[in-house]
Amino acid sequence: MNWIVIDTVIQPACDISFSAIWCNIKLILWYQSDIFLPPGCIFTPTRTGVILNNKELPVTIYNVTPFNKNVWNLIKSSQECPANTGNITDKCFNHRCILEICPYGRK
């Protein structure tokens, strides 16, 4: 079954990412990985991770819950990723991010 990413929030301090996804119903996926699931990407979950672009990638899924707008807004409002703060800079000052390559182009 394919899952479509609607939105993703990264929490670098705890190495957890959250994605709002669609797969017959709207869900919130809580996971840990060094990959970024960007909005619009389509992936297939497996026992050890996900298949994305015909590659099986390691992802630890901690929880999948039905989408709740209030919970999603709380997650988005408490995100720690500086890429979405509106600061105009190419530097990331968060040195604890699990992602090796910033999906927002920060260095």
From Swiss-Prot:
The keyword Cytoplasm applies. Keywords: Cytoplasm, Stress response. GO terms for cellular component: cytoplasm. It comes from the Bacteria. It is found in: Cytoplasm. InterPro entries: Anti-adapter_IraM, PmrD_sf. GO terms for biological process: cellular response to starvation. NCBIfam families: PRK09919.1 (NF007393). Inhibits RpoS proteolysis by regulating RssB activity, thereby increasing the stability of the sigma stress factor RpoS during magnesium starvation. Belongs to the IraM/RssC family. This is Anti-adapter protein IraM.
